[in-house]
Amino acid sequence: MKYCCFLLIIWFLGISGGFAQDKVECWGRYEISIPAKVKGNPFDVELTATFNGPDTTLTVRGFYDGNDTFKIRFMPVKQGGWYYITQSKIPALDGVKGQIECIAPGKGNHGPVKVDGTYNFKYADGTRYYPVGTTSYDWMHVAGNQPDQTVKSLELSKFNKIRMLFFVQNFDPDYPEPSMFPFEIKKITKDEKGKPVYEWDFTRFNPAYFAHVEACVDNLAGIGVEADLILFHPYDGGRWGFDRMPLEAGVRYLKYLTARMSSFRNIWWSLANEYDFLRELKPEYWDTFTHTVVENDPYSHLCSIHTYTAKYYKYWEPEYTHASIQDQAPVE
């Protein structure tokens, strides 16, 4: 009799455990981590997950995060139960199933900003959003405690958006070499002035660099600030060569970035700052880059491209949600 009761208790606990599920707030972030060792370049591995929720199905891309670990990040957009299953040609990554419960958003979480009609913005929960922005190109890449100081200064200000560079900048030739880069380094040589010349492996990323940017974006979300992330910029001058990547390398970078960061509710995509000064990149690249970002962002975050003074891009194209204009004429 005691033995039968013991089996019954074990059976009940097993069934109860089957119904246990992780909880994540609406427009929060849920992360799946799957250990797997693969042959060849792990950044070549294709991994997706399909999430089925209340009247909604979303497919998101996974990514390799180093240390034999693959991850999938998901931002639930409706409250209720969500069920997921992964897809991959790698057996260890394929068919991983689970479920989560999306609960009400916490305090200060209004969801991502969207376009409201033609001329206005609002958060996903319907709260009106009036952008009051600033720019700090490389605040994330400065050594020491300056990134933390920047966040504290923003918290005390009235700004609710900041434009910032994903790649480091070279405005100052004496700007110190960064402690890390977004790509693996194949080789470092010296030029005639003794300065380092880098040869990059654009097929392999440095997850630590991306994780640092992500932590900064999360810190901004914590104080209610939108992160207008500039994906390319002309302020490299060939020092590191991120302003002249081959088309294939640029597309690969954007796919990896969107897989990692589309689930961040406060992210905005700015394809470039003063894109027309990126003269090593062909004009037609920008359509490809834009399509890559939009097609790999299942949440349709705000997307634009910034031009030089009094120049306008094809903002009427459906991929662009708003204009990013550097011109005093519209307000004169």
Model-derived segments and spans:
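Active-site mouth of glycoside hydrolases
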Residues: 110-331
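Short amphipathic, basic-aromatic surface patches that mediate peripheral association
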Residues: 32-39
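Bacterial Sec-dependent N-terminal signal peptides
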Residues: 1-22
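Exposed beta-strand and adjacent loop surfaces of beta-rich binding modules
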Residues: 29, 44-48, 59
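Extended acidic/polar, glycine-enriched regions
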Residues: 50-125, 139-141
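Ser/Thr- and Asn-enriched, surface-exposed coil loops between beta-strands
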Residues: 24-30, 66-68
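Short, intrinsically disordered, charge-balanced linker/junction segments flanking boundaries
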Residues: 19-20, 330-332
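Short, solvent-exposed loop/linker segments at the N-terminal edge
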Residues: 22-26, 39-42
